[in-house]
Every structure is written in C-alpha cells, then in structure tokens.
Amino acid sequence: MGKVVSVILAGGKGKRMGAEVSKQFIEINGKPIIYYTLKAFEECKGIDEIILVLPKDEIDYFKREIEPRFDFKISKIIEGGKERQDSVYNALNSIGDCDIVLIHDGARAFVSNKIIEDGIKYSREFGAAAPGVMPKDTIKVKNLEGFSVDTPNRASLVAVQTPQCFKYNLIKKGHNKVKNEKIQVTDDTMIVELLGEKVYLFEGDYKNIKVTTPEDLILAEHFVK
C-alpha cells in the first residue's frame, strides 16, 4: 500500500461568526476547532502524513498560540492561496511520493474515523471518492426572476462533504488543468469530473458539519459534550 496524505484546509474567516479570530481557531470546550479536526486524522491508522494549509498571515499565530498547546503530528504547514483551489494546488505541489490524498475542510471538526477509512478504501478502488448525505429538505431550481422551475428527485441528490479522496496522480493532473486553463471550481470532485472521470459517492454523516455560522457553533458545542 502506498502512502496516504491528508491535506487540511484551514483558511476560513470568522466573519459570519462575528468572531475576532478565524473560525478554525474559535474554541469549543477550551480547544480550537482545528484541534478536533487534526485529532480525527491523527487517530486514523490509515493516514501516514498530515499537511496543514493556512493563510500566510495566520501561520505565525498558529505556531505561537495554538501549536505549543497540543502535540500535533503535522508534517508541514503550507501557505494557502487566494482561492480554495489555489491552496489545494500549493499543498499538492508540496507532496512528494504519495498514493492517496484526502482533502478536508478544517472547519469539519467531527468527521468520523469510518468516513476517513471509507474514503481511503473507495479512492483506491475507484480513483476518486467523497462522502455525502441526502438533503433533508426539498430542493428547488429557480430562474433568474426568482421563480421555481424544477423540483429534482431528492433521492438522486447528495450534499457532498469532505474529506474528498483521490489517487494523487489523478487530482494533481486535474489541478494542473484548472490552473493552466484558469477554470474556477467549487470543490475538488468537480475537478475530477472536468477530466471526464467519475467520483464514487459513499455514505457520509449528518454530524460531519462545516462549522460556519453561530448556529453551527451551538451544534458543535453539543457534539463535544
């Protein structure tokens, strides 16, 4: 089995939280959100290496205020880019020999060991895989005037989560393509689809939330208790 590397993207700001620090540094039960995220990957036996991606102006803060408090097993800290895809590109370029790479939102602090292990397994089998859950609400498609024009079958819809998991050579090829062709994407599975490849969607977890709003923070505090 080749090496498995996880890339943790911790570039989110805390504006919607009304916080003075970036959301990954907001504390829950005395520990920053990023602590719980890193801990989940450190405790997974299938992960060989962890790369943390931070904005340039937050690397010193992390090293000074966060890292000394915890025994993190981070192999390297990489400077993020202007957009999410730029941050992933920087991280991929920092990886040497690697078989599988998992790309995860730093604010998804409650990812389970099962999701991580399943992601490794399915990406080895299919080349690309991501967890997801069925939307709980009915989804509507609206036109530019604001009117509903379609109601997709909810059974065919998936709200995609992270970690999004790939064979390294596949996702590296995809990121090179969108970089060279200046294509904007919203996540990494979209990059693989642009290559004409399929992404296997496996069962995620409704608990695997991205902590983004004050309401999310209340739920996160409940999960930690």
Curated annotation (Swiss-Prot):
This is 2-C-methyl-D-erythritol 4-phosphate cytidylyltransferase. The gene is ispD. Belongs to the IspD/TarI cytidylyltransferase family. IspD subfamily. InterPro entries: IspD, IspD/TarI, IspD/TarI_cytidylyltransf_bact, ISPD_synthase_CS, Nucleotide-diphossugar_trans. Keywords: Isoprene biosynthesis, Nucleotidyltransferase, Transferase. It comes from the Bacteria. Pfam families: IspD (PF01128). It catalyses: 2-C-methyl-D-erythritol 4-phosphate + CTP + H(+) = 4-CDP-2-C-methyl-D-erythritol + diphosphate. The keyword Transcription regulation does not apply. Its EC number is 2.7.7.60. NCBIfam families: ispD (TIGR00453), PRK00155.1-3 (NF001183). Catalyzes the formation of 4-diphosphocytidyl-2-C-methyl-D-erythritol from CTP and 2-C-methyl-D-erythritol 4-phosphate (MEP). Pathway: Isoprenoid biosynthesis; isopentenyl diphosphate biosynthesis via DXP pathway; isopentenyl diphosphate from 1-deoxy-D-xylulose 5-phosphate: step 2/6. The record marks 16, 23 as: Transition state stabilizer. GO terms for biological process: isopentenyl diphosphate biosynthetic process, methylerythritol 4-phosphate pathway. PROSITE patterns: ISPD. One of its GO terms (molecular function) is 2-C-methyl-D-erythritol 4-phosphate cytidylyltransferase activity. The record marks 154, 210 as: Positions MEP for the nucleophilic attack.
